[in-house]
Amino acid sequence: MNRFKYCFASLLFLFGAVVMAQEEGDVKEERDPGHYNQSKFKQLYEEFSSPNTYRSASGAPGPDYYQQQADYVMDIYLDDKNAKINGEETITYHNNSPDDLEFLWVQLDQNVRAKDSKSPLRNGNGVNIAYTAGNFAETYINEPFDGGFNIESVKDDSGKPLSYTINQTMMRINIAEPLKSGEKISFSIKWWYNIPDHTVNRARSGYEYFPKDGNRAYVIAQFFPRMAVYSDVEGWQNHQFWGSGEFAL
């Protein structure tokens, strides 16, 4: 009899847990109309934009509004045999802001696929219930794919090396002297990276191999180091790129 009571109590507990979980799943998150950023760490200017000479409270350009300018000259080579992209680019950056810039920030979006990328750690969905054999091997067995930028050199317009620091998807370039308002600077970056197999992770960029034809089809995006935005709102926009979202150019 006691055994029956324990079994009945256990079934009743499980039934209650299932009902509660169902009720929690049916509750939809409410949010204020027009407000989509619910992060507790969002920037104050999203809620309290102060008007100034650069822009009005509505965000419209003011009399002192400016935009920086970056000109690119690139030599790009697609190594189809090894599924790699090699590039060398010269960037001419025009400082149209009223500020003197002591360093430059460059976005390295492809580093989201680097071997040591922290992007996978942002996945808070827990362990998948089921894996395909390929996805399981890719996640737990195979050596992580290294699709990040390999920066071979960063040089000024006279060919002298510039020191730089890479932090995940951002690179800070140190310049010899501050770039004053109204001036411009030219520098070059030589780089390459491995192109990922699009059929494995369905990334925004990658290739798909067709054995019958013996060739690859490529979809390429965010493939070159590009200048980060410098604006009157927050100065340098040097937030990390984690694989979702977009930044201004």
Regions picked out by a protein language model, each given a short descriptive name:
Residues 83-112, 117, 128-132:
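Ligand-binding face of N-terminal immunoglobulin V-set domains in extracellular IgSF glycoproteins
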Residues 21-85, 221, 239, 243-246:
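N-terminal, polar/Ser/Thr-rich
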Residues 31, 109-144:
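Acidic glycine/proline-rich low-complexity segments
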Residues 128-153, 157, 190-249:
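Extended, low-hydrophobicity, Ser/Thr/Pro/Gly-biased non-transmembrane segments
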Residues 89-91, 95, 108-110, 183-197:
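Short, hydrophobic/aromatic-enriched beta-strand segments in well-ordered soluble domains
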Residues 103-104, 116-119, 166, 197-206:
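Short, solvent-exposed loop/turn and secondary-structure capping segments
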Residues 1-25:
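Bacterial Sec-dependent N-terminal signal peptides
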Residues 169-173, 185:
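Short strand-edge motifs at loop-to-beta-strand transitions and within beta-strands
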